[in-house]
């Protein structure tokens, strides 16, 4: 008798949730690098705090604040509760959301319900998700149908070679994946965001994307949640390869390198973005929006209100950061820049 691959995938998705809620899954020594930068403080700011404008446009959608709920989960029964609570919070706050990988939804019809959030979030920017390792041009019709089914506005393609290498039976053949990415991005009919999962996109990877018809890049740098660490907990029950769990391009470095290599491509900064100050620094360094994922997991298990509370504090801190450096809007913030400490 053969095992059901869909059921196995759903089980792994639930294990990911459990590990993220109960184990130490952040990088233990590697940091995002944002501590090396300071946002300029202006004691003579000429802004009115209550008039500071955080709104922006991303992938053709208007956001009340430059914040996305990052990709987390899908497929398990609990995933549906988490995703609906996250989406409802995004609807209340006027921000966007990335879904977890829809591979399980494509493989198993029963998993589709965990991704369907439009009932509670009819107006949000909603970004679907698929893995680069699994991406094939032949998938375009089925993938487009999956995006249509959930009412997505775009597609995130996540590249995760280190995570896959740590995963039991991971998809470790990435040969030809850049060409497939560019082919699908040109054919799918949705704006495509290339993203990492928390080990970072740096200069070498960005150089490979020149001319590729992607709409944005989520640098998803190192310093927050380590998926190489998570997969080792899932596979072994502990961290058997600690050096690999601490490997990646720190978020601030990733943001700087990709911005320099691809100056016209909109960037998402994620990976260890934990505070409004982190977000302000990332935006001042050239990100169009920021994304936050794992800090919202426990609140999302609890309630919509818990997610809204966490995000509102995050957004309020970001608002004060703009006010304190004399920036009335996000364009002005980018003009302020940051100071790198010696």
Curated annotation (Swiss-Prot):
Mg(2+) binds at residue 164. PANTHER family: ISOPENTENYL-DIPHOSPHATE DELTA-ISOMERASE. The gene is fni. Substrate binds at residues 12-13, 101-103, 163. Involved in the biosynthesis of isoprenoids. Catalyzes the 1,3-allylic rearrangement of the homoallylic substrate isopentenyl (IPP) to its allylic isomer, dimethylallyl diphosphate (DMAPP). This is Isopentenyl-diphosphate delta-isomerase. FMN binds at residues 71-73, 101, 129, 195, 225, 272-274, 293-294. InterPro entries: Aldolase_TIM, FMN-dep_DH, IPdP_isomerase. Its EC number is 5.3.3.2. It is found in: Cytoplasm. HAMAP family: Idi_2. It catalyses: isopentenyl diphosphate = dimethylallyl diphosphate. Pfam families: FMN_dh. It comes from the Bacteria. One of its GO terms (biological process) is isoprenoid biosynthetic process. GO terms for cellular component: cytoplasm. Belongs to the IPP isomerase type 2 family. It is an enzyme of class 5 (isomerase). Its cofactor is FMN; NADPH; Mg(2+). Its main location: cytoplasm. Homooctamer. Dimer of tetramers. Keywords: Cytoplasm, Flavoprotein, FMN, Isomerase, Isoprene biosynthesis, Magnesium, Metal-binding, NADP. GO terms for molecular function: FMN binding; isopentenyl-diphosphate delta-isomerase activity; magnesium ion binding; NADPH binding; oxidoreductase activity.
């Amino acid at each position: 008798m053969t095992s059901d691959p869909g059921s196995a995938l759903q089980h792994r998705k639930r294990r990911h949730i459990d590990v993220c809620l109960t184990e130490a899954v952040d990088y233990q020594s590697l940091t995002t690098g944002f501590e090396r930068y300071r946002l300029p403080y202006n004691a003579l700011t000429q802004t009115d705090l209550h008039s500071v404008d955080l709104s922006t446009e991303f992938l053709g959608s208007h956001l009340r604040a430059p914040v996305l709920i990052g990709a987390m989960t899908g497929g398990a029964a609990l995933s549906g509760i988490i995703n609906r609570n996250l989406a409802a919070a995004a609807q209340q706050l006027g921000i966007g959301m990335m879904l977890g990988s829809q591979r399980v939804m494509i493989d198993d019809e029963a998993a589709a319900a965990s991704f369907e959030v439009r009932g509670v979030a009819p107006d949000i920017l909603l970004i679907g998700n698929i893995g680069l390792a699994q991406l094939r041009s032949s998938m375009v019709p089925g993938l487009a149908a999956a995006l249509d089914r959930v009412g997505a506005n775009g597609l995130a393609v996540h590249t995760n070679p280190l995570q896959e290498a740590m995963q039991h039976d991971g998809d470790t053949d990435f040969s030809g994946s850049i060409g497939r990415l560019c082919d699908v991005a040109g054919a799918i009919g949705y704006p495509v965001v290339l993203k990492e999962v928390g080990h970072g996109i740096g200069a070498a990877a960005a150089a490979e994307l020149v001319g590729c018809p992607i709409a944005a890049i989520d640098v998803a740098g190192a310093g927050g949640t380590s998926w190489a660490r998570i997969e080792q907990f899932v596979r072994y029950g502990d961290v058997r390869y600690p050096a690999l769990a601490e490997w990646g391009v720190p978020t601030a470095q990733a943001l700087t390198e990709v911005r320099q290599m691809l100056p016209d491509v909109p960037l998402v900064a994620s990976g260890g973005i934990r505070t409004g100050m982190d977000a302000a620094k990332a935006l001042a360094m050239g990100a169009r929006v920021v994304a936050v994922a794992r800090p919202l997991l426990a609140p999302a298990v609890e309630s919509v209100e818990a997610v809204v509370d966490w995000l509102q504090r995050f957004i309020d801190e970001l608002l004060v950061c703009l006010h304190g450096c004399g920036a009335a809007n996000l364009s002005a913030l980018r003009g302020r820049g940051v100071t790198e400490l010696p």
